[in-house]
């Protein structure tokens, strides 16, 4: 029976064990009526009022669901929050080695392998099926009414705040979640369920913010996107964030920000690479995050040689595909402009210019001029 605290705790312990066996690094439980969601909505609305979301208009919608996650899935009584480590190789501690390879394309580490959204949802569905089987075997009275739905950065959910309430870490000044024994190189996912599983109060109480006076992530950010708010908290101005500029932004990258992007063509890891807590970063336990098509070492000119079909073929099942071929080439053009002088770069930029959109051509012209300025 699921009507006693001991039995509920036993089921939670079983779920945690299954989650770990599937490859999740951690697992916690949150009630959908947790007051943190209303508090986060206030912060979101302030952020929106300042225009810091840029063109990400989806942040303006579904505020009722953000404040009350139960509206997303009927009969939700608990949310299982999980995290999944994605590092394949440990980076040098407290340094940004990406800056040492100006002719290479730098892609955020989470995006070099399979799209984590697909991986996460697949694992969460497997976890849900295991729970369903457990209920059928040991608690048949709950099996028929069991409702679940997996999410991974795919719905209006305050994902980091939810994970923080589940005891999976604290929100750092770079606004990413940090675990004291695992750093921040992990992705998050949620499984909404109809089971009345209580929050892990003890687990939550053992993890509090330990950023202290450290400002490493703030200082290392090339565009100074991390800002302290009047309330003493920190947020990220997406309009300045390299991840936003190279992934979410559809159109022209502001000219004044292009030199600061360097050779980052999809996302940016700088604020994580410099974080002292990532000396504890754990490596991935599944192969999905292994780099595909040498995306951990590929040169800018190699990527520039891709045509539209190459892009579709080599980004199949990858989060990179969502940025689209033309914007991807826009990003590579900017990086080529920032690379050391090379006549070969100038020649390749001009050869490909007629094949791309007017918007990308403008970035090619900028990149060409940057190269000429170094000659």
Report residues per predicted region.
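Alpha-helical adaptor scaffolds
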Residues: 293-326
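Amphipathic alpha-helical scaffolding segments comprising HEAT/armadillo-like alpha-solenoid repeats
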Residues: 310-314, 341-353, 373-375
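Short coil turns that connect the paired helices of HEAT/ARM alpha-solenoid repeats
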Residues: 321-323, 351-360
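C-terminal amphipathic alpha-helical segment
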Residues: 252-288, 313-317, 321, 327, ...
């Amino acid at each position: 029976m699921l009507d006693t605290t001991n039995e509920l705790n036993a089921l939670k312990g079983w779920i945690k064990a299954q989650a770990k066996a599937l490859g999740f690094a951690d697992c916690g439980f949150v009630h959908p009526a947790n007051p943190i969601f209303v508090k986060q909505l206030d912060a979101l609305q302030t952020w929106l009022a300042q225009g810091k979301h840029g063109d990400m208009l989806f942040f303006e919608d579904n505020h009722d669901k953000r404040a009350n996650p139960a509206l997303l899935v009927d009969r939700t009584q608990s949310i299982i929050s999980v995290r999944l480590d994605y590092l394949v190789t440990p980076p040098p501690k407290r340094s940004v080695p990406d800056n040492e390879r100006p002719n290479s394309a730098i892609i955020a580490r989470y995006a070099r392998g399979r799209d984590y959204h697909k991986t996460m949802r697949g694992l969460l569905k497997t976890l849900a099926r295991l729970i369903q089987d457990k209920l059928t075997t040991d608690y048949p009275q709950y099996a028929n009414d069991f409702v679940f739905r997996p999410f991974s950065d795919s719905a209006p959910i305050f994902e980091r705040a939810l994970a923080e309430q589940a005891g999976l870490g604290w929100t750092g000044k770079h606004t990413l979640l940090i675990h004291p024994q695992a750093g921040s190189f992990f992705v998050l996912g949620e499984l909404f369920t109809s089971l009345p599983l209580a929050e892990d109060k003890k687990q939550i109480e053992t993890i509090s913010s330990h950023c202290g006076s450290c400002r490493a992530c703030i200082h290392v950010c090339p565009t100074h996107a991390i800002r302290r708010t009047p309330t003493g908290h920190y947020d990220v101005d997406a309009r300045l964030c390299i991840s936003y500029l190279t992934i979410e932004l559809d159109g022209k990258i502001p000219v004044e920000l292009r030199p600061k992007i360097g050779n980052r063509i999809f996302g940016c890891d700088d604020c994580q690479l410099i974080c002292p807590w990532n000396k504890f970063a754990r490596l991935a336990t599944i192969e999905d995050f292994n780099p595909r098509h040498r995306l951990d070492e590929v040169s800018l000119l190699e990527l520039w040689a891709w045509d539209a079909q190459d892009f579709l073929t080599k980004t199949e099942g990858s989060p990179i595909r969502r940025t689209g071929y033309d914007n991807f080439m826009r990003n590579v053009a900017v990086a080529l402009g920032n690379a050391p002088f090379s006549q070969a770069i100038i020649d390749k930029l001009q050869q490909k210019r007629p094949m791309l959109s007017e918007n990308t051509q403008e970035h090619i012209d900028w990149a060409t001029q940057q190269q000429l300025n170094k000659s």
